[in-house]
From Swiss-Prot:
Ranges where the ABC transporter domain occurs: 6-236
EC number: 7.6.2.11
Top-level taxon of the source organism: Bacteria
Record's catalysed reaction(s): ATP + H2O + polyamine-[polyamine-binding protein]Side 1 = ADP + phosphate + polyamineSide 2 + [polyamine-binding protein]Side 1
Sorted UniProt keywords: ATP-binding, Cell membrane, Membrane, Nucleotide-binding, Translocase, Transport
Family assignment from sequence similarity: Belongs to the ABC transporter superfamily. Spermidine/putrescine importer (TC 3.A.1.11.1) family.
Protein's UniProt name: Spermidine/putrescine import ATP-binding protein PotA
Summary of the function given for this chain in its UniProt record: Part of the ABC transporter complex PotABCD involved in spermidine/putrescine import. Responsible for energy coupling to the transport system.
Gene from which this protein is expressed: potA
Amino acid sequence: MTQPIIELHQVTKRYADNTILSNINLTLESGKFYTLLGPSGCGKTTILRTIAGFTDATTGDILFAGKRINDVPANKRNVNTVFQDYALFPHMTVAENVAFGLTLQKRPKSEIAERVNQALRLVQLADYGDRAISALSGGQQQRIAIARAIVMQPQVLLLDEPLSALDAKLRRQMQYELRDLQQRLGITFLFVTHDQEEALAMSDEIFVMNQGEILQSGSPVDIYDEPINHFVADFIGESNILPGKMIDDFQVAFGGHQFECADAGIPVNEPVEIVIRPEDLTLTDLAHAKLTVTINTQLFRGDYYEIAATDGLGNDWLIHSVNPAEDGDQIGLTFRPQDLHVMRFGEKEAEFDARLETYEGTEDDRFDET
C-alpha cells in the first residue's frame, strides 16, 4: 500500500437532528481513480465537500498526506473541485476561465500562459483559448472545467457528478477521456456519481454508499461479483436475489432445491439471500435443468434478449440470453456453483472480509475447470 493522500477517520456530519454522514472511514492512495457511488441524498457529495473544505465535519478527522486539515481553509488545501454545473464564467474566454485561479494567486503572466496552454492540451482543446464559453458544446465545457482545476496542479481532483448533464453517447466518450486523463496526470481522482456504469467503467476502487454510510468498498469486479448485502447487489447492475438457507459449507438451498456454491463459513440452516446475475444464467432443456421457469416476456436489447420468467415458487427471474424464448413456455435454467453468491443478513464489511479470508482459494480448487 502506498502512502495515503486522503484519510477520513470516524467523520460524522449532522445538521440539527439530521445525520448526513455517520462514522465515515475512508482511505485514498496517490494516483488512483476512486468513486463514491450511491443514490441521491446518500451523503457522497457531502464527503466531497468535506474533503474540499466547503463543509465542516461535525466530528472526526480529515487527513491530507498524514496531516490533519479540518481547520485548513479550502483555498489552502491542495485539492480542486469540478462541479456538476461546471461554474464557468460566461463573460470570460476559455483561456481566462482556465487562468482564473492562477490570476487570483498573482502568478507571473508568462507562467499563467504556459500552464493554461498545457492544461488545454491535456484536455485536447489546445486551440480553444480565445473562444467564448457560449460557443462550446456541453462536453467541451466539461473539459474546460477540468482544465481550470488541473491548471492549479492539485494532488487530488474532486469531481461532483460532472457527466450528469451530458447525453448518453457523450457521457460514454467522456468516461474514456476522464480515465485516460487521470492516468496521464498520475494524481488522485475522487468521482461522485449515482450511475453504476460510470463507476464500474472508470474506477480503481468504489465506495458504495447509502443513508450516510459506506456499505462496501473494493474493486469494480469485487463489488459486482461479491456484493455484501441486498442493497449493494440490487444497486450495482441487475440481479436475481432469492431467499435461501445455508445447508453446509459450499451447499445452499433455494427455489425448492439444494445446490453447490462457492461460499463457506456460514452457520448451518441460517437464512440467507442468494444473488445470481442475469448473464450467468443459461437456458437449457428441461432434462438438463437445475431450475425450471415459465417465460413471461422478453425484450430484445441488441446483443442479447432480456427475459423475464417465474419459477414454481413464484420467484421472479431475469435472464440475459443470446437466444430468444417463447412467452408461456417452460424452460430450464442452469448455472455454475461459482456464479452463486450467498449474502448473510446484517453482515458488516469487516465480518464479510474476514469470512472470505478463511476460505479464500479453496473455492478455486473445488471449481477448477480443467
